[in-house]
């Protein structure tokens, strides 16, 4: 990237997401409790205080945006462990908020790039869910190391097969490209074929294809129409 990357304020959502997960788990078990499958041994039939506290968690619903992300990821990757779906949804939710990018746009980009396949490798060598080139991934990881103190040990091309790392770097990259080009279509085109190529075409008033951006934005509109599941 030609433009110097700037530091972005960090928004910590890990705790909120963890609470959301716990609330979801509890909600799933509420019907069993209310149906009388939990029975008190006390003479008055009262539910012990510690159980009442757990049941009260029903009032704390997970963020709707997180639930929508989770449902979309799960619809494409029902073949993987539930814990992995949580992990992917979590990083999309947190990093999108941190970088002020609509998570549905991130999901659309992932859909077009890899169909949510974390082990995808393109003929050009781009890897992972957001199809990041190894050299670009290494540069992005080094930049995040300076900003956030984050750096995966012994970065290798295969490091990009980890969906959490891949998504974190991909969202950061998309944010920076949008800052550089100030236009979503151009940022998406640069994500696809490199910022140097797009910068050259902009400076020399050369024609460029909107095909990739159109695919992403079409998927984005479809995801925006997806109804959030009711828990």
Range-by-range predicted roles:
Residues 1-86, 221-231:
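N-terminal secretory targeting signals
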Residues 54-231:
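Catalytic glycan-binding domains that act on GlcNAc-containing polysaccharides
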């Amino acid at each position: 990237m030609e433009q110097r990357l700037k530091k972005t304020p960090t928004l910590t959502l890990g705790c909120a997401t963890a609470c959301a997960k716990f609330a979801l788990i509890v909600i799933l078990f509420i019907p069993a409790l209310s149906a009388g499958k939990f029975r008190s041994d006390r003479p008055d039939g009262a539910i012990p205080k510690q159980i009442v506290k757990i049941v009260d968690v029903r009032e704390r619903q997970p963020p709707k945006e997180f639930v929508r992300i989770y449902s979309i990821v799960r619809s494409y990757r029902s073949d993987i462990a539930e814990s992995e779906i949580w992990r992917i949804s979590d990083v999309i939710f947190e990093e999108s908020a941190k970088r002020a990018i609509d998570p549905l746009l991130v999901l659309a980009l992932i859909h077009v790039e890899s169909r949510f396949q974390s082990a995808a490798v393109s003929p050009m060598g781009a890897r992972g869910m957001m199809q990041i080139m190894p050299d670009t991934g290494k540069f992005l990881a080094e930049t995040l190391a300076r900003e956030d103190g984050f750096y995966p040990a012994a970065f290798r091309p295969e490091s990009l097969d980890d969906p959490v790392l891949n998504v974190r770097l991909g969202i950061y990259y998309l944010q920076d490209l949008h800052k550089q080009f100030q236009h979503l279509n151009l940022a998406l085109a640069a994500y696809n074929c490199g910022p140097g190529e797009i910068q050259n075409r902009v400076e020399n008033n050369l024609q460029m294809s909107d095909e990739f951006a159109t695919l992403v934005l079409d998927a984005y509109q479809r995801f925006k129409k997806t109804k959030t599941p009711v828990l």
